[in-house]
Amino acid sequence: MLRLAGEEPIEARAVGESYMRDGVEDVVFCYLRFASGLAAHLHLSWLDPHKERRFTVVGSKRMATFDDMELERKVTVYDKGFDQSYRSYGEYIARSGDIWSPRISNEEPLRIECTHFVECVRSGEQPRSGPESGVRVVRVLEALQRSLEESARAAAV
């Protein structure tokens, strides 16, 4: 998500609930705010009865979803949104256009990642997600953990 955003969040909030064991959250809701105005909402749960790995992006012109559990249509792009009407202030016209799904390889992501890592070790090339990427992810995870421990108080990243 950080790569897609092109920036790190400036604020992270998390709230969770422990149902099975005290101190270990089974369900967590997160909110990330970015300097550009971008926001991300996450729902994380190992306890949820439905296994989901879905990512939704809502943009000003189109929307897209990535669903890793889907076999045929992992990515779906929606030409859907709202266009501002200039007849009067604050009016919007709903726009709903085409929906399409580009063909995406059905290879297992972990296999691709491991193969790429081994190739980089052998060739000396830099991996697509190197140590800097890992540091950025851990920084966000630590901020979310701090927020979780402080009852969803916003934590600087």
What label would you give each PLM region?
Residues 1, 111-115, 141:
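A general structural signal for well-ordered alpha-helical segments in protein cores
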